[in-house]
Amino acid sequence: MTPVSSHGLAESIFDLDYASWKIRSTLAVAGFVFYLGVFVVCHQLSSSLNATYRSLAAKEKVFWNLAATRAVFGVQSTTAGLWALLGDPVLYADKALGQQNWCWFHITTATGFFFFENVAVHLSNLFFRTFDLFLVVHHLFAFLGFLGSAINLRAGHYLAMTTLLLEMSTPFTCISWMLLKAGWSDSLFWKANQWLMIHMFHCRMILTYHMWWVCFCHWDALTSSLHLPHWALFLFGLALLTAVINPYWTHKKTQQLLHPVDWNFAQEEAKGSRQERTNGQVPRKKRL
């Protein structure tokens, strides 16, 4: 395919009538279906090819597939977010009201992804009889925030796209957790990935400071273009990210580098280890 035809294909994908609610809702549904497909394909491939995956408990398998799905979304979000932050002249010129067709595409598909995340979290909680309030609130804020951007035709795209850039850590988080479950926490690759992941969380903190700066510099335009509930939700969510979520996860990931532990399932593993010791068996290192 020639560069000209490639450029034309990209334009045809993004050059849609985004003023139409039908187009936006269709893309949101497409985002949901696509990432559901990623989840299912990951399960099928891991079941066939990965010994570590087959040895996991059902709850851990769900987490494994969700981590892989989030990593794929993280690649999409990081690519789009970096271009919005560093490369797009329209968004750079007007950070409050600037809009681009390619941004509409990512905002609507991200809405579908975050809806998938909420469905997956609630079904997992129901099936395994668990409830993580922190995780539920986090995903609910993300979905409502992007739903507000997908609905509001006047909303600028810069802040929405830089919010997507916060997903830059998810591919590294996925790799870290999978290798940890495989027993590779002593490997140089795991440690290097962990260092990069910690760096990404520091970059997330810097990015939230930049987003506050954009909010303060364009306060009037943002207040007039966003619906009050959406604007309040965004500010509250950004405050949580800045003051609680980013510092907390940066601390946890740094702690994990020094003491490699899967705290997501620490209690289950501790219980399993006690049972194995009771039966006179020594836990074996898992392999990929």
UniProtKB/Swiss-Prot annotation:
GO CC annotations on file: endoplasmic reticulum; endoplasmic reticulum membrane; endoplasmic reticulum-Golgi intermediate compartment; endoplasmic reticulum-Golgi intermediate compartment membrane; mitochondrion; presynapse
Regions crossing the membrane: 26-46, 71-91, 103-123, 131-151, 225-245
Listed GO MF terms: ceramide binding
Record has Membrane as a keyword: yes
Membrane topology: Multi-pass membrane protein
Subcellular location: Endoplasmic reticulum membrane; Endoplasmic reticulum-Golgi intermediate compartment membrane; Endoplasmic reticulum
Region (Disordered): 269-288
Key words of the record: Endoplasmic reticulum, Membrane, Neurodegeneration, Neuronal ceroid lipofuscinosis, Transmembrane, Transmembrane helix
Record-level GO BP terms: adult locomotory behavior; adult walking behavior; apoptotic process; associative learning; ceramide metabolic process; cholesterol metabolic process; glutamate reuptake; lysosome organization
TLC domain residues: 62-262
Motif ER-retrieval signal, chain ranges: 285-288
Keyword presence, Chaperone: no
Entry function: Could play a role in cell proliferation during neuronal differentiation and in protection against cell death.
Subunit structure: Interacts with CLN5. Interacts with CLN3.
PANTHER family: CT120 PROTEIN (PTHR13439), PROTEIN CLN8 (PTHR13439:SF7)
Disease: Defects in Cln8 are the cause of the phenotype motor neuron degeneration (mnd). Mnd is a naturally occurring mutant It is characterized by progressive motor system degeneration. It has intracellular autofluorescent inclusions similar to those seen in human Cln8.
Protein name as it appears in the record: Protein CLN8
Species whose genome carries this gene: Mus musculus (Mouse)
Record gene name: Cln8
